[in-house]
């Protein structure tokens, strides 16, 4: 996708194969890490994503999904939010701003609206509560550092609640380092 710092996209051919997924699952079962943090681009596109989540949860791990929210609107993923909630997966979702204009400039037209609908789907299942964590990620547009995380979190919480009825747990501020 044009905004991605690792040039990830649904049309890319580089995906984790079954052998690698099996090795990861075997390692998780053997070592039982406290956290399994699954990231991508959009890691849910991997045919092994649900198996990785299920096996990690079976091993007693806390699972986090670095989710771009728009995946919840894509054909074939209509049940993804149910799967995530059923497995109590912490969702860490990219939302580079709480306004449509800024998100459109960074990620393209329609992304903000899809992201809001995705957040509303997650909220409807209880995400944003203590049991189903929903954390958002802010990253500034262009080569600059983000502002104060606590101030931005308060701004996000007020704007998203007022405009869309959306709640979430925390906001994380990051700065992307282009590596692709």
Model-assigned labels for residue ranges:
Residues 1-6:
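Local cysteine-cluster metal-coordination motifs and their immediate loop/turn environment
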Residues 8-17, 31-46, 57-76, 84-120, ...:
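Core AdoMet radical
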Residues 23-26, 48-58, 79-82, 114-117, ...:
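Alpha-helical scaffolding segments of alpha/beta enzyme cores, especially the outer helices
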Residues 24-25, 53, 89-92, 129:
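Short hydrophobic/aromatic-rich motifs at helix boundaries and adjacent loops
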Residues 92, 99-180:
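Radical SAM enzyme [4Fe-4S]-AdoMet core and its adjacent flexible, acidic
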């Amino acid at each position: 996708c044009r905004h991605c710092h690792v040039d990830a996209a649904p049309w890319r051919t580089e995906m984790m194969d079954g052998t690698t997924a099996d090795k990861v699952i075997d390692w998780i079962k053997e070592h039982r890490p406290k956290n399994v943090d699954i990231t991508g681009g959009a890691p849910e596109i991997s045919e092994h994503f649900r198996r990785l989540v299920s096996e990690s949860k079976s091993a007693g791990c806390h699972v986090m999904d670095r989710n771009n929210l728009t995946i919840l609107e894509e054909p074939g993923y209509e049940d993804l939010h149910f799967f995530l909630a059923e497995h109590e997966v912490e969702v860490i979702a990219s939302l580079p701003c709480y306004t449509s204009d800024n998100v459109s400039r960074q990620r393209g037209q329609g992304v903000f609206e899809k992201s809001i609908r995705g957040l509303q789907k997650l909220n409807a299942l209880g995400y944003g509560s203590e049991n189903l964590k929903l954390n958002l990620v802010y990253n500034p547009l262009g080569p600059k550092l983000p502002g104060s995380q606590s101030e931005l979190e308060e701004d996000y919480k007020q704007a998203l609640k007022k405009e869309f009825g959306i709640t979430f747990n925390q906001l994380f501020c990051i700065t992307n380092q282009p590596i692709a």
